[in-house]
Amino acid sequence: MTERRKELDIEPALVPQVWEDAVAACLAKDRSRRPQSAAEVAQRLQLAPGQTRTRMAPGKSSNRKALLVGGIATLSVIALAGLYFGGLKRQAKPVSQAAAIPEKSIAILPFENRSEDKANAYFADGIQDEILTRLSKIADLKVISRTSMQHYKSAPENLPEIARQLGVAHILEGSVQKSGDAVRVNVQLIKAANDSHLWGDTFDRKLIDIFSVESEVAKAIADQLRAKLTGQEEQVIAAKPTDNPEAYDAYLRGLAYMVKPASTRGTTIGAQKYLREAVRLDPKFALGWALLSYVDALSYLEHPGQPTAAIREEARQAGETAVTLQPNLGEALIAKGYYYYACLKDYGTAVHYFDQARQFLPNSSRIPESLAYVARRKGQWDRSDSFFNEAARLDPRNVNLLTQHALLYIELRRFPEALRKLDQVLDIAPDDLDTLALKAAIAQAEGDLPRSAAILAPLRPVAEQSNALETQIYQAILERRPAQIIGRLKEILATPDPTLGYINGELRFWLGWAQEVTGDHAGAQESWRQARRELESFLNEQPDNFILIGDLALTNIGLGNKSAALALLERAAHAITIEKDAIDGPIPIEFLARGAAGMGDRERAIVALQKLISMPYDGALGAGVPLTPALLRLDPMFDPLRNDPRFERLAASQARVNAK
């Protein structure tokens, strides 16, 4: 309504907030929320009988006057609504959602680090997160998830606009100053509509007493917002997760790695290091065990993680320990569910734990987000879409959530919808490299190489950003001009990062492919031999890593070792199936199509492509875009099939996705 008022040049003083609220109520979609009489409209406009009786004589004239006031109020609201919608019709601009914002809603901005030691920024982040976590466990509040806050400053000037973007009525700002074991926390609660200060306080405590600050702040905010707390919620707000300040400090350091906007292999390793230290210092620290389990399961699942049996076992043990220590800890239940989802692909058990967690974490976006992932793996595309939308209502500016929603559309080859989601990401993080690379990968899949080249040209991804780097290499290969990228790849691989594991070998496979496209057969053979050595060294500890197995199969085809390649392709097909995973299950089929084409087995390659071209899935190479007719036309790996009429028909077709 505020935005519409500005568009129509209505002075704020002439449209009090109470009138805007009354208009919103009259126009509510839910009939039960609308005023049911003129008197109720008058009451909403603060013209209730309690206000008007002192000015009225008793008797019938009082009733008539009340009706008159109510009638005038109603007509005024109708007139204002007419002005509102008249302007909307004339200008056809989006309407602010401020009218729908619940009063008991809050977002907590990043806390400012005022410590002299700037390395203490992790502590300020942690205090913000812990206060938010406590509030999010109150069912009567709407609390925006932390991940939507990451791209805001600690004390921005445009609080009303930020609140509108997040769909909340209140904002909490704060600062933290840490010196040794002394901590000062300053907070202030602001009503966003008029940028007014509702409550604030300063807390000076020792590190060992920091939990009391988090509890007091959460309780004060709940009181200010008039939230109704159950007995269980009061206990949760007052809970002390550990009695060991060193363990809590290590936990906050690990948490800081997890809240970084860009997640990389390095951030995962950093988080694991500090979380292991936290639970070593306090083996009864359930929250620490829960986060360690979640990080491990995430690392096991996501490319370029290292899905080793050791990481999977640590995720299991950490999750079990967390649930045993605190059976009603929502974070522990989520971690247990994520272990079953990511490590075992036991979706039924995963959903059971996620559903259990809901009653303890009513504001957690991670629960519907996790349910979206489960539905996607089961091929329940519409259900996944719905869960992503539910998560977005709790976490509207979560870059990872928006990206994952875009990936759902990419897997379905619904590229326009994917691009809209990616543009939302870029509105929040304009220079996000992975998002730009994904947009370029979509352009490649649509056959628009000039568009993808323009997006990729300014980017300088490093080895750790392997998806973006491989998208650049693929661009050069599709253009059949990879000479420049070969030089960059050699430079990157001259000092390989050991934390990347098998990804170094994967990049050497790409180097060999690029060299082969330029006609440097000898150089390609040398790169592939080195790639094979590096990839094979990880196979024993990652026996079910179908991406690693597929990379190794294609490398062996490049080296002319068909028997080894066929054995690996069969192994990849057994490591993951469509029945177990609708997204990743088709990846071995793409490896087979590429491998069969390279070996000259047209029949097997074309049969595989006929399956893939209408199947939703996550692509085998680069950014994970599925094969499209345009990519069949452009990709040199399919050159051996070009004279076959069946392949030509596939390459000339329009992609029609069978999402059943």
Please give the residue ranges for each predicted region.
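Long, domain-scale regions corresponding to catalytic signaling modules most often appended to membrane systems
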Residues: 28-29, 33, 40, 47-91
